């Protein structure tokens, strides 16, 4: 598993730590508490974050939620499934060339997952970036290997937070 450092120029986007406004932090803590209550039966390990249209802040919510849950001591992986406009690697300063979800899917080797995961320094989260942007995102996300990857992540982590494209534009989120 690789390590990435947090980028201070993007900290304003992801502000659950440091000098974030109290109300902002408390809103995410409240969301975390409600999700933990819902998942107390152990059946809510994967949380998919989407929006209806672009620029509504779904990636912001996904990253802040992942960091807030991780701050409570849970093992959290954030998966960038927005294979059309992947931004998590850029925001968290993970090299774009680093292998990600699409690379693991196309390799058809579950062992490739371990090398694709990146632990983000000082955040408590692990990230699976989108990887190489494919010409056929919906078909790739529909592949049987995708289901195996998510099953592996659900076994290894307490929570799997998934950032997807807006639902009104493409069917990628519905496939997941």
At which residue positions do the language-model features occur?
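P-loop NTP-binding module
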Residues: 1-176
């Amino acid at each position: 598993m690789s390590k990435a450092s947090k980028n201070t120029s993007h900290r304003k986007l992801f502000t659950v730590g440091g000098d974030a406004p109290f109300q902002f932090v408390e809103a995410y803590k409240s969301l975390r508490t409600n999700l933990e209550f819902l998942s107390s039966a152990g059946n809510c390990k994967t949380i998919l974050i989407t929006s209806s249209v672009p620029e509504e802040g779904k990636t912001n919510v996904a990253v802040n939620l992942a960091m807030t849950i991780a701050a409570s001591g849970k093992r959290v992986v954030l998966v960038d499934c927005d294979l059309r406009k992947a931004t998590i690697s850029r925001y968290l300063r993970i090299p774009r060339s680093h292998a990600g979800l699409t690379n693991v899917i196309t390799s058809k080797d579950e062992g490739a997952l371990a090398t694709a995961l990146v632990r983000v320094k000082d955040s408590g989260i692990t990230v699976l970036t989108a990887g190489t942007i494919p010409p056929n995102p919906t078909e790739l996300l529909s592949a049987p290997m995708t289901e195996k990857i998510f099953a592996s992540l659900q076994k290894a982590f307490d929570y799997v937070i998934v950032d997807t494209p807006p639902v009104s534009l493409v069917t990628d989120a519905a496939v997941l």
